[in-house]
A protein has these predicted regions:
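Membrane-proximal helix-turn-helix segments that form the acceptor-binding/catalytic region
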Residues: 22-40
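Acidic donor-binding loop of glycosyltransferase active sites
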Residues: 38, 159-171
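Carbohydrate-associated surface elements
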Residues: 46, 65
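A short helix/loop element that forms part of the nucleotide-sugar donor recognition site in Leloir-type
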Residues: 71-83
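A conserved mid-protein helix/loop that constitutes part of the nucleotide-sugar donor-binding site
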Residues: 87, 91, 96-110, 128-131
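Nucleotide-activated donor-binding/catalytic signature segment of Leloir-type glycosyltransferases, i.e.
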Residues: 130-152
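Short alpha-helical donor nucleotide-sugar binding micro-motif in glycosyltransferases
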Residues: 148-149, 156-161
Length: 171
């Protein structure tokens, strides 16, 4: 039988695995995947480059598909957050260090723009990183944290964003 492995990211580098043995076990699993899998699928060019440079391993880049959100006018997001079409840059995802949100906030604070930075999503493991982000964003009223969103609110955020950004370290 043939073995095909799909790699979603460089998981052993995630901050949540750095204490204890988790990182070592996951890293060993990565090495086993490289050694024993007949084919390796990766979801990003960055991970593809990592496997080529680290292991000399050829991989197949197949990004995840997405369900296109229903296009919606800015109603709920205008009422709740004062957002209008093309008035903001959107980050949406779990608020964890490896998503690169810290870099995003730091960079955005140095950009002269009338756009807002909307950070949508909930914390995954602890609230300490969320507190750190809010402290980092303090004093810049262009940066907005919505918390977890879904349904019509999610569709409106996607539909009306000027641009979407995902500054991830590992994905």
């Amino acid at each position: 039988k043939r073995v095909v492995v799909t790699i979603h990211g460089i998981d052993w580098q995630r901050e949540k695995w750095q204490s204890g043995l988790g990182s070592k076990f996951i890293h060993q699993g990565e090495k086993n995947a490289v050694k024993y899998a007949d084919e390796v699928i990766v979801l990003s060019k960055g991970v593809q480059d990592y496997f080529k440079e680290t292991y000399g391993r050829k991989t197949h880049f197949i990004p995840n598909g997405v369900n296109r959100p229903q296009t919606r006018e800015a109603n709920l997001i205008t009422d709740k957050f004062g957002l209008k079409k093309d008035s903001y840059i959107l980050f949406l995802g779990r608020l964890v260090p490896e998503k690169g949100i810290r870099y995003l906030v730091e960079a955005f604070k140095n950009v002269k723009t009338d756009k807002k930075l909307v950070i949508a999503g909930g914390s995954s493991d602890t609230d300490s990183f969320m507190k750190e982000l809010k402290e980092l964003a303090k004093g810049d009223d262009r940066i907005l944290f919505t918390g977890f969103v879904q349904g019509q609110m999610l569709d409106e955020l996607y539909s009306n964003a000027y641009i979407y950004t995902l500054p991830s370290d590992l994905e």
